[in-house]
From Swiss-Prot:
Biased composition (Basic residues): 189-199
Location of the region described as Disordered in the Swiss-Prot/TrEMBL record: 1-42, 139-211, 277-302, 340-473
Biased composition (Basic and acidic residues): 171-188
Taxonomic placement: Eukaryota, Metazoa, Chordata, Craniata, Vertebrata
Primary gene name: Tox2
Chief localization: nucleus
Keyword line: DNA-binding, Nucleus, Transcription, Transcription regulation
UniProt GO BP: female gonad development; positive regulation of transcription by RNA polymerase II; regulation of transcription by RNA polymerase II; response to gonadotropin
Protein name: TOX high mobility group box family member 2
Annotated organism of origin: Rattus norvegicus (Rat)
Length: 473
């Protein structure tokens, strides 16, 4: 290999030097490739990606200097183009060959040097080169077909100035895939059909003009004379007759038209008045139906606390007697004569109640009088028997309730009841009368049960059995 001009190596010298080792010659510095012809400037975008790919894959920084002129690239490209498109202009074959050879020569002249593993690189570069040339050529052909200023027989490979690279790629895509380009003609847009309003048969008809009246009168006569005359012929004849008509006859037709117009206005006013008279009741009813929906029946509000306690058996007369400071004995008899509670109330009592009877006072009692505390109040009149707690349960309820300490008595001791009355409680029977106990209880002596006001302690949750009247001995 001669050292006179190492940068310019012929293709044959590069090809023949493959058998020699890499140590026989010096690798010249890489120089940028010569610029292609102006006709191939539009192909630079497509080839730049493939060249960079090939450069990145080359090992040890060595670039391929293989001769592509011995390959039959034009035949491959022509066969591919024929398979895709079906036909090719014969005048463009030399152009394709010139582009391929000039591109390969420019590529090889600036990149001499051997490379290991050339077959794989050769195959990849050939496929990339053929695809890029095919896409570019298809874009050129589609650009010529789409209103290109150059004549169809021209061999120039430059596209029209109005086309761009993106348009060429899109056109090539539509050509290769066989898809149709969507139509963008604004005149082909579907027009929305206008819906005609239905005319009311009761609406009065508009009056016609004077010429229309004359046309009606003369149309029948013309049709009788010329049965084969078309509507256009009849219109021409009527127009000529109207022009030749005298002014007085025209005024007669105009007066008829004015009279018909006045009648039409009167009929139209009456028709609109009838519409107005019919529409308000219907619209008013619809508005009333919307504004006043049927009222929903709301159930009566239930009381928050079901308290069938003292309020159920204290009548206004009893409260009035209580306010008027009646005798405690009469009040006790009234309370005892009424049914206290039909059963145990499970609902909580109201938070504040003026009368909250407390448990009977915890006073020291003799042993024989303990059983009388557990018995319910005696009934002075026939009344339904309320359910009564057994003695142990009543005792537990009394122990569970925290009685307030005995305070000052607001009422004197309640008078006793007759000793012959029996008890309705299943507890122990009344003890036998003894001479130690008097029949009456003066206000100064001790008593077994009292009624007092207790505003501080909450009322009991069970039926009030706190007003206890023991049977006297």
């Amino acid at each position: 290999m001669s050292d006179g001009n190492p940068e310019l190596l012929s293709t044959s010298q590069t090809y023949n030097s493959q058998g020699e080792s890499n140590e026989d010659y010096e690798i010249p510095p890489i120089t940028p490739p010569n610029l292609p012809e102006p006709s191939l400037l539009h192909l630079g975008d497509h080839e730049a990606g493939y060249h960079s790919l090939c450069h990145g894959l080359a090992p040890n920084g060595l670039l391929p200097a293989y001769s592509y002129q011995a390959m039959d690239l034009p035949a491959i490209m022509v066969s591919n183009m024929l398979a895709q498109d079906g036909h090719l202009l014969s005048g463009q074959l030399p152009t394709i060959q010139e582009m391929v050879h000039s591109e390969v020569a420019a590529y090889d002249s600036g990149r001499p040097g051997p490379l290991l593993g050339r077959p794989a690189m050769l195959a990849s570069h050939m496929s990339a080169l053929s695809q890029s040339q095919l896409i570019s050529q298809m874009g050129l052909r589609s650009g010529i077909a789409h209103s290109s200023p150059s004549p169809p027989g021209s061999k120039s490979a430059t596209p029209s100035p109005s086309s761009s690279t993106q348009e060429e790629e899109s056109d090539a895509h539509f050509k290769i895939s066989g898809e149709k380009r969507p139509s963008t003609d604004p005149g082909k847009k579907a027009k929305n059909p206008k819906k005609k309003k239905k005319k009311d048969p009761n609406e009065p008809q508009k009056p016609v003009s004077a010429y229309a009246l004359f046309f009606r009168d003369t149309q029948a006569a013309i049709k009788g004379q010329n049965p084969s005359a078309t509507f256009g012929d009849v219109s021409k004849i009527v127009a000529s007759m109207w022009d030749s008509l005298g002014e007085e006859q025209k005024q007669a037709y105009k007066r008829k038209t004015e009279a018909a117009k006045k009648e039409y206005l009167k009929a139209l006013a009456a028709y609109r008045a009838s519409l107005v008279s019919k529409s308000p009741p219907d619209q008013g009813e619809a508005k009333n139906a919307q504004a006043n929906p049927p009222a929903k029946m709301l159930p009566p509000k239930q009381p928050m606390y079901a308290m069938p306690g003292l309020a159920s058996f204290l009548t206004p007369s009893d409260l009035q007697a209580f306010r008027s400071a009646a005798s405690p004995a009469s009040l006790a008899r009234t309370l005892g004569s009424k049914a206290l509670l039909p059963g145990l109330s499970t609902s909580p009592p109201p938070p504040s109640f003026p009368l909250s009877p407390s448990l009977h006072q915890q006073l020291p009692l003799p042993p024989h009088a303990q059983g009388t505390l557990l018995s319910p109040p005696l009934s002075m009149s026939p009344a339904p028997q309320p359910p009564v707690l057994p003695a142990p349960m009543a005792l537990q309820v009394q122990l569970a309730m925290s009685p307030s300490p005995p305070g000052p008595q607001d009422f004197p001791h309640i008078s006793d009841f007759p000793s012959g009355s029996g008890s309705r409680s299943p507890g122990p029977s009344n003890p036998s009368s003894s001479g130690d106990w008097d029949g009456s209880y003066p206000s100064g002596e001790r008593g077994l049960g009292t009624c007092r006001l207790c505003r501080s302690s909450p009322p009991p949750t069970t039926s009030p059995k706190n007003l206890q009247e023991p049977s006297a001995r």
